[in-house]
């Protein structure tokens, strides 16, 4: 087992001899790297990155931010590989003390799905994660949202017009003459600007096929607060790494693809509550991420936080031809419904994590063809619904009752093909032709329910991914058939699906913003799995959100995913093994919580710079997971207890040791709970395979 001689060595950091810059957490992420450090009295800091053939490349000053006494840099646009970051203090205009991280492993984004069909790469970045040649990068903050400018081509002769504000710049792009790739980088908490269109940023590129636009956030705290994003008449658009909350626009959606869009990729965003709308189903806001009249779309690695209506797909297309979309590796975290709710489209829905969903998972209507592949369902009430048949009309008993049931849609049905999905907990699901199936998690015979499952079914389940759905399988209402788009090589793209369990672990680790974002919330599964009501403490916290201070956002102590810590809690047999794999962490990876936290966290900086005991200073994190050594280190004074709990709530380990060996745990995602002096801290970790 590797040993660490200093706290900084365990963190994967090295300080230059005699330097005053004290580094905290640093790591690689998806095509980005980050570092935090304590202020040493410098006026500012320059940051340089090296790696992948580059040496001492200075990053933009806007990427270096100060949060109280803590500084942070996030460096986007890095190709997958190994890098170091060098932090240099600047005093009176002169560079001085510096510190350099150890090697940070940067991973590539998963560019899979229909948005990448036909050789397209949406946005201002190349397929390798670096900016496209000639790309213009503009930084948008709360103070610059109305004043940022860009000279944009606004005529066929190349006449340039100086356009002001981020919406003003996009309005100039609408004329369709500007071909320069544009990257709008949002920094921090940004509220409504003066130039929004009915409360939304509108990306309308005038149907140009040569404009490439990325709208992204920098770091874990980039937040769109109070306004939404609307996309129409646009191609080659990417939206990523944004937290979107408290939307109060006229349209009401966090992000909405409205019409005439192609090759759009929305990924790694956090979707929170919006303001309540006028309809009774809009108490949590309207749609989180909706799409209609658009094709060649990918929505991936997004985190949906208790949204009421997550993904409406389709509205008035009127045809089943030519509309293609992919949903993969999204975390439907206690969101209620529409994951997605599909009209007309051919939709590939794979490797998503359905985590405690009170109403339903995916739903198919109006002749849509939905391929549900290797998704993980935990306590999702109705994992799959086909309108006007199966569970949709039998949900309340043994009599087919489309009048009183059929609340999902009342529209004619489509068809769902299902392969490799995992179900657990309380759920109801009726496969095509099944003699028995699960009702609220209990095996039930079709005969006892009086159901002909060749007519009334939720999905057609196959044993091989490439099995075609025969044309004899039709929806009960509308006699619609599956179009087998997923086995048509002229339509389908190349991709690699994880098994369902591995997908869940990857989703938990990577969905949402960098490091999971700055806003943290832990749901109470015993309440929130079955509830579609507004979580009022969560709502209050979102309304009160004013931006990040460099520390974690605390979770109320009443919220917890953990099982009881009493001796009666179930304990897993640690001798069992698993063949599933998880996304590996860097060998220098560490996750920590401070003594002021009560949630899973964004790692904070450590003020330690020499070989000291973690418990010797209250400034050091109270709990630290060192992935390379597969151990926890506890740094609180006095007595304490540590519980390690699986994602399903099973406690697998309890300890009062200051160093807790986790090498005996099988690979997977765990929640660690530290209880001391009447307070509780939580940390979510990924334990990789040996």
Positions of predicted regions on the chain:
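C-terminal outer-membrane/trafficking sorting elements
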Residues: 574-576, 584-586, 590-690
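Right-handed parallel beta-helix
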Residues: 211-221, 235-246, 261-277, 287-288, ...
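Extracellular beta-strand/beta-solenoid scaffold signature
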Residues: 196-203, 225-229, 248-258, 278-291, ...
């Amino acid at each position: 087992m590797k040993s660490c001689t200093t706290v900084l060595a365990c963190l994967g950091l090295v300080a230059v001899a005699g330097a005053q810059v004290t580094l905290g957490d640093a790591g690689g992420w998806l095509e980005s790297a980050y570092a935090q450090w304590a202020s040493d009295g410098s006026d500012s800091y320059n940051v340089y990155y090296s790696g992948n053939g580059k040496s001492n490349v200075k990053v933009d000053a806007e990427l270096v931010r100060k949060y109280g006494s803590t500084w942070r840099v996030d460096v986007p646009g890095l190709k997958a590989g190994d890098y170091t970051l060098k932090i240099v203090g600047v005093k009176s205009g002169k560079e001085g003390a510096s510190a350099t991280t150890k090697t940070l492993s940067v991973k590539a984004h998963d560019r899979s799905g229909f948005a990448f069909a036909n050789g397209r790469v949406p946005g201002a970045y190349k397929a390798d994660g670096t900016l496209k040649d000639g790309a213009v990068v503009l930084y948008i903050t709360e103070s610059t949202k109305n004043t940022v400018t860009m000279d944009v081509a606004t005529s066929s002769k190349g006449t340039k017009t100086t356009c002001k504000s981020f919406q003003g710049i996009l309005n100039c792009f609408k004329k369709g003459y500007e071909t320069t790739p544009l990257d709008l980088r949002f920094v921090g908490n940004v509220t409504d600007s003066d130039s929004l269109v009915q409360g939304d940023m509108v990306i309308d590129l005038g149907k140009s096929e040569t404009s490439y636009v990325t709208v992204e956030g920098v770091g874990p705290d980039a937040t769109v607060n109070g306004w939404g994003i609307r996309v129409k008449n646009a191609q080659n658009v990417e939206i990523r790494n944004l937290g979107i909350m408290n939307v109060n626009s006229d349209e009401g959606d966090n992000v909405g693809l409205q019409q005439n869009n192609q090759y759009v990729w929305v990924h790694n965003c956090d979707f929170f509550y919006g303001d309540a709308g006028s309809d009774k189903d809009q108490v949590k806001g309207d749609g989180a991420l909706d799409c209609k009249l658009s094709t060649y779309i990918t929505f991936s690695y997004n985190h949906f936080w208790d949204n009421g209506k997550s993904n409406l797909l389709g509205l008035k297309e009127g045809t089943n031809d030519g509309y293609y979309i992919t949903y993969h590796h999204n975390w439907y975290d206690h969101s209620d419904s529409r994951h997605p709710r599909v009209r007309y489209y051919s939709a590939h829905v794979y490797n998503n994590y359905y985590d405690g969903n009170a109403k339903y998972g995916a739903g198919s209507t109006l002749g849509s063809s939905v391929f549900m592949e290797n998704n993980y369902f935990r306590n999702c009430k109705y994992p799959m619904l086909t309108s006007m048949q199966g569970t949709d009309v039998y949900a309340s008993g043994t009599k087919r009752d489309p009048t009183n049931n059929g609340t999902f849609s009342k529209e004619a049905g489509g068809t769902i093909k299902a392969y490799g999905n995992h179900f657990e907990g309380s759920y109801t699901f009726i496969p095509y032709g099944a003699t028995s199936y699960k009702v609220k998690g209990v095996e039930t015979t079709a005969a006892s329910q009086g159901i002909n499952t060749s007519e009334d079914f939720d999905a057609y389940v196959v044993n091989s991914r490439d099995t075609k759905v025969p044309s004899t399988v039709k929806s009960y209402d509308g006699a619609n058939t599956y179009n087998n788009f997923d086995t048509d090589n002229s339509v389908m793209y190349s991709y690699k699906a994880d098994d369902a369990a591995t997908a869940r672990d990857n989703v938990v680790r990577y969905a949402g913003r960098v490091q999971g974002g700055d806003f943290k919330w832990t749901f109470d599964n015993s309440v929130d799995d079955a509830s579609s009501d507004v979580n009022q403490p969560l709502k209050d916290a979102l309304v009160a959100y004013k931006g990040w201070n460099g520390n974690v956002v605390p979770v109320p102590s009443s919220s917890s995913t953990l099982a009881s810590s009493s001796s009666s809690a179930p304990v897993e047999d640690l001798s069992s093994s698993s063949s599933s794999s998880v996304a590996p962490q860097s060998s220098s990876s560490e996750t920590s919580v401070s003594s002021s936290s009560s949630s899973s966290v964004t790692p904070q900086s450590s003020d330690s710079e020499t070989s000291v005991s973690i418990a010797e200073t209250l400034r050091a994190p109270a709990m630290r997971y060192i992935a390379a050594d597969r151990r926890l280190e506890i740094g609180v004074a006095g007595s304490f207890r540590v519980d390690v709990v699986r994602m399903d709530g099973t406690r697998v380990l309890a300890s009062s040791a200051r160093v807790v060996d986790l090498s005996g745990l099988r690979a997977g995602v765990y929640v660690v709970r530290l209880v001391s002096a009447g307070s509780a801290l939580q940390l979510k970790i990924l334990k990789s395979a040996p």
